[in-house]
């Protein structure tokens, strides 16, 4: 019974680790999209004035 428990824990850990690595690439893509959006905002004077904390 203990062996089955260890196998379940190991399988859960492997699945969790793999899905975490996959979500990291999605986070990178999202942060790149956000950066492009902010750059577009900073080039627009009205948006730049409304968001000085992003456009510095």
Swiss-Prot record:
Positions of region (Ser-Xaa-Pro motif, crucial for potent interaction with nAChR): 43-45
UniProtKB keywords: Acetylcholine receptor inhibiting toxin, Amidation, Disulfide bond, Ion channel impairing toxin, Neurotoxin, Postsynaptic neurotoxin, Secreted, Signal, Sulfation, Toxin
Role summary: Alpha-conotoxins act on postsynaptic membranes, they bind to the nicotinic acetylcholine receptors (nAChR) and thus inhibit them. This native peptide blocks mammalian nicotinic acetylcholine receptors composed of alpha-3-beta-2/CHRNA3-CHRNB2 and alpha-3-beta-4/CHRNA3-CHRNB4 subunits.
Written domain comment of the UniProt record: The cysteine framework is I (CC-C-C). Alpha4/7 pattern.
GO molecular function, one term: ion channel regulator activity
Keyword hit for Secreted: yes
Protein name: Alpha-conotoxin EpI
GO cellular component entries: extracellular region; host cell postsynaptic membrane
């Amino acid at each position: 019974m203990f062996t089955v428990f260890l196998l379940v824990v190991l399988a859960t850990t492997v699945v969790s680790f793999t899905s975490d690595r996959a979500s990291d690439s999605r986070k990178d893509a999202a942060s790149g999209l956000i950066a492009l959006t902010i750059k577009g905002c900073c080039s627009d004077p009205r948006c730049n004035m409304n968001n000085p904390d992003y456009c510095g």
